[in-house]
Amino acid sequence: AIGKMLKDKHGTDVRVLPAGNDVARLQPLRTGRAFASAMGAGVYFAQEGLFEFGSKEWGPQAVQLTLTTVDCNAGSLGVAADSGVKTVADLKGKRVGFVVGSPALNQNTLGVLAFANLTAKDVKVVEFASYGAMWKGIVNNDVDAAYGTTITGPAKEVESSPRGIVWPPTPPDDKAGWARLQKVTPFINPHLATCGAGISKEKPVQLSNYPYPIYTVYANQA
């Protein structure tokens, strides 16, 4: 949509470079191959030099936010309906996806688990090479849960698969749960999702969200 707007209003062609994790998203920007990157929470970690961005090769990055949004969708753990999971606490002992090199997805996952006082030790961690592969893992019954936005294409694919999809709620009136979640992911807040896979205005779900995507440039580009 943004590419079309730039083309229609400014005659600018946009070429999209696909990437499977946070480091891969930012690398083309760092090397000058791209002028902007659609990041997630990984941009916060890049700015602070945390997790994968805490290595000697990276360190704190002078990144700058240019555009973001909050809409009817939310970001949380999508879970295969046939797993029997109804609440976040039900994820104990289940297979939960993590993506190598993607601290945003992994920390967000840990934040949702913390809502129910769970950690990575309480679930079966299944690692994937990319976001898409992780969600495909639900369809293929290699994993039971994955973090993403409710409107993501892979979530729609899970919804239409034999496994189906549910989004265990994180109700805002659970103050203790939210205190634990925000201790892990302080940039995430309660949000009523009214659109997405298995979600509608008629069947909303109390989930969580943060401004996403975060279109990012380096400070010397702004």
Question: Model-derived features: where do they sit?
Answer:
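Bilobed "Venus flytrap"/periplasmic-binding protein-like clamshell domains
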Residues: A1-R15, C72-D144, I151-G153
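Pocket-flanking alpha-helical
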Residues: G3-K4, R15-E57, V85-K86, G132-G137, ...
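Extended interaction regions within the primary functional domain
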Residues: K7-H10, R25-P28, Y44, E57-G59, ...
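Extracytoplasmic
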Residues: G11, N21-A24, T31-A34, P60-Q61, ...
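Conserved hydrophobic/amphipathic secondary-structure segments
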Residues: A36-G75, A114, V166-L181
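Pocket-lining segment of extracytoplasmic ligand-binding domains
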Residues: A41, E52, S83, K121, ...
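Short, flexible turn/loop "capping" segments at secondary-structure junctions
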Residues: T69, V88-D90, L207-P213
